[in-house]
């Protein structure tokens, strides 16, 4: 099953594609500002509207901080570059195409190496504890991959990742980084942002050597936190775009 996208007329599809390009370019730029990317090695993608299963992704060799909306390439689920300049990184293909193919929620797939979630992935038994209000929302959405030691070099490994992710939206990949999926770019970005902040709080608390003060589990399903509304996710990315409009306006070109 491929990710669910809407079918639009050609003109509407062009407008929708450009809007997605600008949102994704903003996510690349903000990710660079926050230090989430690993030199030129990380990758983010989004399915395009239309009948054909095509996705936008960054081409190999670009820093996140330099990417513009027009730089993103269009690929199919077989890894062929259909539009744009550059090549598709093989690791990116095996992760993104397989998740897009199998997970209907995964219209957007973000794969990065943010400091605190990545550090958590390196700890034996490292998981986000129910120790901050953010976790009341996040904990039921996270899966931890403790088997993936090898680099992602084939579809078999991509399929394993997609199966393990299942209907969750966040995967902390053991000794690696994090993959977050969402129905829209802004939802995936917002969830990634919250997860990384939550990991930062926990890693900071753990560095004291003191015992974490956890929240009783009975509160988990009674409170979703202020980030349960996708409107806030849209407003969050829009706020960053206003900053970029002032300081890095070329992102949307």
Task: Show the residue positions of the predicted features.
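Glycine-rich flexible loops
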Residues: 1-253
């Amino acid at each position: 099953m491929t990710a669910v996208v809407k079918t639009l007329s050609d003109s509407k599809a062009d407008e929708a594609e450009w809007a997605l390009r600008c949102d994704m370019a903003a996510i690349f730029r903000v990710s660079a500002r926050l230090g989430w990317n690993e030199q030129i090695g990380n990758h983010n993608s989004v399915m395009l509207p239309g009948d054909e299963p095509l996705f936008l992704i960054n081409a190999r060799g670009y820093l996140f901080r330099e990417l513009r909306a027009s730089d993103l390439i269009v690929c199919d689920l077989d890894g062929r570059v259909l539009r744009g300049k550059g090549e598709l990184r093989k690791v990116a293909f095996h992760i993104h195409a397989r998740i897009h193919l199998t997970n209907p929620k995964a219209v957007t797939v973000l794969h990065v190496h943010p400091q605190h979630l990545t550090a958590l992935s390196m700890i034996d038994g490292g998981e986000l504890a129910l120790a901050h209000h953010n976790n009341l929302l996040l904990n039921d959405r996270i899966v931890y991959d403790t088997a993936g030691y090898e680099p992602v070099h084939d579809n078999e490994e991509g399929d394993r990742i997609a199966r393990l992710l299942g209907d969750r939206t966040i995967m902390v990949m053991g000794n690696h980084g994090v993959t977050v999926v969402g129905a829209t770019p802004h939802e995936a970005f917002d969830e990634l942002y919250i997860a990384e902040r939550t990991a930062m709080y926990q890693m900071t608390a753990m560095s004291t050597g003191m015992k974490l003060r956890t929240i009783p589990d009975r509160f988990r399903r009674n409170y979703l936190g202020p980030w349960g509304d996708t409107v806030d996710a849209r407003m969050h990315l829009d706020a960053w775009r206003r900053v970029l409009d002032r300081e890095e306006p070329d992102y949307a070109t």
